Amino acid sequence: MFALLLLLQAPDPAPLAVRLAGMTAVTGYEQRMVDSILTLLPGATRDRAGNAVLRLGAGAPARLVACPLDEPGYVVGGIRDDGWLTLHRVPGRVPPLVDQQLEGQRVTVWGARGAVPAVVAVRSVHLTRGRGGAEAPFTADAAYVDLGAMNRAQVAAAGVALLAPVALAKRPHLYGDSLLAAPVAGRRAGCAALVAAAHDSRPAAGTTVIAFVVEQNLSRRGLLTAMHEYGPFTRTLLVDPDSTAIRDAGDLGTVARERLAVRYAGTPVETVPLHEVTPLAGRLRQWIGGGQ
């Protein structure tokens, strides 16, 4: 009973932002993140696209508020005889220099048995001493991942196979005056605010659909599935620091955005002000209740 009461209580959005910032949701591999959202939101369900969706109210008009979950990342593209992994970048929109952020960094490989820590190798400074520097910038094609395996069998024993998702290791960092730094911190903080707002909102007349959508970076499949399955909508609110225009809005209606101020966007230290997450949850709660 106590555990049930905890689930029914609205979570504190700032600590939840830190928690979500420590999770990984590579485009096309958001299932674990969706599982967590479903646990946090009693009554929410997984739709055919893989979104976590909570429907409030009934009838017209219908409105949608959506927060994207996905992030740029990689999959295991090859497993060498010596146990090293090679990578392919997952398709979709990515920030500039995304591959260069990978070189020499800790990564997490998500295998059948869960998270496997690993590292992306760098050139040996001893073996390359006296040679000219690399002319071309580092790319995913030059990445070799070491997870401590000595051969293919040890890779398999770790639960890692081809197409296993790979992303930078998540180590959310709090610094300064209530600042949170982590990859895609803006999206994670926005989704935390929406989870909190969804818990105790009183929806306006009609239907309000709250969706945590997948594959936004690739084809907006999650958002478009929500539009086709639950729309048409008169209004849509996107909780996302990405300001890319929605050109095929169709039945999304009037599209607006809510976002936190983000510094160093698209980098491993993307930074958001944690003290602004609770006010964002308040604005989202007001929107769900029929406010502008």
List each language-model region with its residue ranges:
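N-terminal hydrophobic/helix-forming segments and targeting peptides
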Residues: 2-292
